[in-house]
């Protein structure tokens, strides 16, 4: 069963969670998450940010107040150093098939979304 972990600092949030799916994750993951979990999700390509560097993506996320779904620890480091927003949904299950990724997210994302809605700046979902 996937583990869901969070940081110790919370930030207030008064709106629904909007997810941006990082470029190293499958682009179709955005539609899958949106359909399965009834949450707004977009991949970076659809947002015109596929070739942007992490600092540019972080700045755009900060302006929008959205959540990045990423395997990239750089976003975790930036939020830890600079503070939220954005929030980070950090997927640490390694390189897995889409099927395994869907299984991990199906088990961990409901609790992860609740933590994000309650202001957790960093939520980790792993396949363990």
Region spans (language model):
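C-terminal structural segments of small proteins and small subunits
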Residues: 86-128
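Small/polar loops that bind or transfer phosphate-bearing groups
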Residues: 21-22, 70-71, 93
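Flexible, charged surface loops at secondary-structure boundaries
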Residues: 11-14, 61-63, 117
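N-terminal first-folded block
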Residues: 18-67
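Glycine-rich loop at the start of a catalytic domain that most often binds anionic cofactors/ligands
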Residues: 80-85
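Residues at secondary-structure transition points
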Residues: 48-56, 73, 96-100
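Intrinsically disordered, low-complexity and often Lys/Arg-enriched segments
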Residues: 1-17, 128
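Nucleotide phosphate-binding site architecture
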Residues: 76
